[in-house]
Amino acid sequence: MNISRMEQRVLHVLAQGGYIRHQREDGHICEIECFTREGYLLSDCTMAVFQQLRRKRLIESRMGSPYRISFKGRENVRAQLNNR
């Protein structure tokens, strides 16, 4: 599956334990914020990247909770070197 650089960056943060918090208005998602595991805000996660990840089913939300990486997303994320 083709995954853009921005999608890959967001997926990598989610794979390490991050999450995407969303705000709804009239049943539609109007605002998103992507947080790393340490609690920092990731500025690379835009609404367009979020919609692409949802369309490809690489992220999922269960019962209104924040969006996290799905099993399909874990399979498609490429490994990256960490400082840890």
Swiss-Prot record:
HAMAP family: UPF0386. It holds the Pfam family YjhX_toxin. Belongs to the UPF0386 family. This is UPF0386 protein Oant_1614. It comes from Brucella anthropi (strain ATCC 49188 / DSM 6882 / CCUG 24695 / JCM 21032 / LMG 3331 / NBRC 15819 / NCTC 12168 / Alc 37). It comes from the Bacteria. The lineage of its organism: Bacteria, Pseudomonadati, Pseudomonadota, Alphaproteobacteria, Hyphomicrobiales.
